[in-house]
Amino acid sequence: MMITLRKLPLAVAVAAGVMSAQAMAVDFHGYARSGIGWTGSGGEQQCFQVTGAQSKYRLGNECETYAELKLGQEVWKEGDKSFYFDTNVAYSVNQQNDWESTDPAFREANVQGKNLIEWLPGSTIWAGKRFYQRHDVHMIDFYYWDISGPGAGIENIDLGFGKLSLAATRSTEAGGSYTFSSQNIYDEVKDTANDVFDVRLAGLQTNPDGVLELGVDYGRANTTDGYKLADGASKDGWMFTAEHTQSMLKGYNKFVVQYATDAMTTQGKGQARGSDGSSSFTEELPDGTKINYANKVINNNGNMWRILDHGAISLGDKWDLMYVGMYQNIDWDNNLGTEWWTVGVRPMYKWTPIMSTLLEVGYDNVKSQQTGDRNNQYKITLAQQWQAGDSIWSRPAIRIFATYAKWDEKWGYIKDGDNISRYAAATNSGISTNSRGDSDEWTFGAQMEIWW
């Protein structure tokens, strides 16, 4: 009996430790891709994106090692009320050597509190850096609605007919505003904070298995006292989004219409660039000295239209399919906008529940508003893949691939005084450009991809 009693405190301590470990369990999520590739004409793998487009078809066309490592934990819970702490650190290297150092990007650090407001059951309040309700096309790694960044908000307010979310986030432009109170040029340029205010109404039932989401984003440049924006800067802008999601064929189809103005047109995803101004402006100092400040960003006064349809569906036991079709027109007052349309498919044939063959075919066409000339490219990738499951979304996956790309480009980009590409222009203008001309290339390699 004495032996039993002596063992009791140890047993209690062990049990308490186990229970504590379970209560403090950390959620580990993330994403990663890495591989090796070669180019037919020699050297390491090249990747292909048509000049003027904002994305590329990604299968067999990614030349970097990239990872996002997310750690999170529910740190407090009482009934249906809880606090959750979430973090995300991202890394990207060129996958050229064994030892490749990089500065990590601290992309998320936020706290989310659920059911904390008694009269708004089911809602979540949050603050910090966060990936906020992002909308993207996986096939081309294109985010068309993404206001992520430092911010705060409340989401999923149940209105009965839909759920309302309100948020404010920030994105900052380097060297976007100027002051002339100092003789030191290094004190005269300051980063410009852009504030975005986001309102979304989701879950609106429109038809059987179909829902609608509506959103309005307003973004504006928020300058520090004593600083001002360049003449012609757009200062602010709006973006309106309507997205219909239809559940179908064991997958979904999303149809999206977006319209943006001025500061919201540069990135076209809900983040503002309000200090984009005129190409240059001159100020005279008190001593009579004149200084010309080159504004190394595009004047983005104008508008953007985007019509997008994309999805992922199952076509039977053996076939899955991803697809995308998009038209985007950026019409700027300075005539430096673009018209971009793209269409692509990625069918998957499943030989076994863990082995498949994928074919990705994508075409891009981008027209210069200034000249009317067009750049175009098509890319074809054939890949043999082994994945953890029989879905086109199953990961991890290991694949070997061969890619062929053919392009014909008629225009490039004007370069500023620092030889940095900034403005869309035609090659026949006589100005230095980086148009790729008319050529083709093929690559081959192997890649892993995982999310968890």
UniProtKB/Swiss-Prot annotation:
<dbReference type="InterPro" id="IPR050286">
    <property type="entry name" value="G_neg_Bact_CarbUptk_Porin"/>
</dbReference>
<feature type="site" description="Greasy slide, important in sugar transport">
    <location>
        <position position="451"/>
    </location>
</feature>
<keyword id="KW-0812">Transmembrane</keyword>
<keyword id="KW-0406">Ion transport</keyword>
<comment type="subunit">
    <text>Homotrimer formed of three 18-stranded antiparallel beta-barrels, containing three independent channels.</text>
</comment>
<feature type="site" description="Greasy slide, important in sugar transport">
    <location>
        <position position="66"/>
    </location>
</feature>
<feature type="site" description="Important in sugar transport">
    <location>
        <position position="143"/>
    </location>
</feature>
<dbReference type="GO" id="GO:0046930">
    <property type="term" value="C:pore complex"/>
</dbReference>
<feature type="site" description="Greasy slide, important in sugar transport">
    <location>
        <position position="393"/>
    </location>
</feature>
<keyword id="KW-0626">Porin</keyword>
<feature type="site" description="Greasy slide, important in sugar transport">
    <location>
        <position position="252"/>
    </location>
</feature>
<keyword id="KW-0813">Transport</keyword>
<feature type="site" description="Greasy slide, important in sugar transport">
    <location>
        <position position="31"/>
    </location>
</feature>
<comment type="function">
    <text>Involved in the transport of maltose and maltodextrins.</text>
</comment>
<dbReference type="GO" id="GO:0015481">
    <property type="term" value="F:maltose transporting porin activity"/>
</dbReference>
<dbReference type="GO" id="GO:0009279">
    <property type="term" value="C:cell outer membrane"/>
</dbReference>
<dbReference type="Pfam" id="PF02264">
    <property type="entry name" value="LamB"/>
</dbReference>
<comment type="similarity">
    <text>Belongs to the porin LamB (TC 1.B.3) family.</text>
</comment>
<feature type="signal peptide">
    <location>
        <begin position="1"/>
        <end position="25"/>
    </location>
</feature>
<keyword id="KW-0762">Sugar transport</keyword>
<dbReference type="InterPro" id="IPR003192">
    <property type="entry name" value="Porin_LamB"/>
</dbReference>
<protein>
    <recommendedName>
        <fullName>Maltoporin</fullName>
    </recommendedName>
</protein>
<dbReference type="InterPro" id="IPR036998">
    <property type="entry name" value="Porin_LamB_sf"/>
</dbReference>
<keyword id="KW-0998">Cell outer membrane</keyword>
<dbReference type="GO" id="GO:0006811">
    <property type="term" value="P:monoatomic ion transport"/>
</dbReference>
<dbReference type="GO" id="GO:0042958">
    <property type="term" value="F:maltodextrin transmembrane transporter activity"/>
</dbReference>
<feature type="site" description="Greasy slide, important in sugar transport">
    <location>
        <position position="99"/>
    </location>
</feature>
<keyword id="KW-0472">Membrane</keyword>
<keyword id="KW-1134">Transmembrane beta strand</keyword>
<keyword id="KW-0732">Signal</keyword>
<dbReference type="InterPro" id="IPR023738">
    <property type="entry name" value="Maltoporin"/>
</dbReference>
